[in-house]
């Protein structure tokens, strides 16, 4: 969230690496953030702007970076469902912050949830079952063809991250995952 409470779409907690500016996202207002540029031309988008740009043409995976943004993200999704004709299954809320995911499940159990994990696949699976998640998002090194099939047999989709090297992408595709999280979609 920006300093004035807007939902900002950016990977890091600062703008230092991805823009021509410096500072923490939560210390800058939306107006201040809009001054800075990504790759010299694009402004930092709000989540609403991303929804409008996507215009229902794709699944939107929203990774919650902070628990503080949870309720606002839920409210924005609900607005697009009730006022703009979107469907809940056009969204997927994921996070490493399992408290945030539990809050999503508690506040609106229609919103699909993806459980992110970097280390413990079994614990993530147990948590996913507990909150009735739709998918599991493990670091790709945790996956084998066998455990991918086992996860899917339990009714969960598998979206591994972040797979950027062509060789790794080709290998993971042989596991029959449901999707791949990458910085380079053109390599898929």
Can you say where each PLM-predicted feature lies in the sequence?
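Short, glycine/acidic-enriched loop or turn micro-motifs at the edges of active sites
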Residues: 1-3, 15, 66, 165, ...
């Amino acid at each position: 969230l920006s300093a004035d409470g807007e939902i900002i779409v950016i990977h890091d907690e600062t703008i230092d690496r991805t823009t021509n500016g410096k500072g923490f996202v939560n210390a800058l207002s939306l107006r201040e953030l809009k001054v800075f540029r990504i790759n010299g031309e694009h402004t930092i988008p709000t989540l609403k702007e991303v929804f409008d740009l996507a215009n229902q043409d794709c699944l939107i995976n929203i990774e919650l970076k902070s628990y503080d943004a949870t309720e606002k993200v839920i409210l924005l999704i609900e607005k697009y469902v009730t006022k703009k004709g979107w469907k809940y299954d056009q969204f997927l809320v994921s996070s490493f912050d399992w408290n945030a995911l539990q809050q999503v499940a508690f506040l609106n159990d229609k919103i699909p949830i993806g459980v992110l994990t970097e280390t413990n696949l079994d614990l993530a699976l147990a948590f996913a079952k507990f909150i009735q998640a739709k998918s599991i998002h493990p670091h790709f090194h945790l996956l084998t063809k066998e455990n991918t099939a086992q996860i899917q047999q339990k009714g969960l989709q598998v979206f591994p991250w972040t797979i950027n090297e062509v060789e790794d992408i080709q290998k993971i595709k042989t596991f029959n995952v449901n999707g791949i999280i990458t910085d380079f979609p053109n390599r898929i």
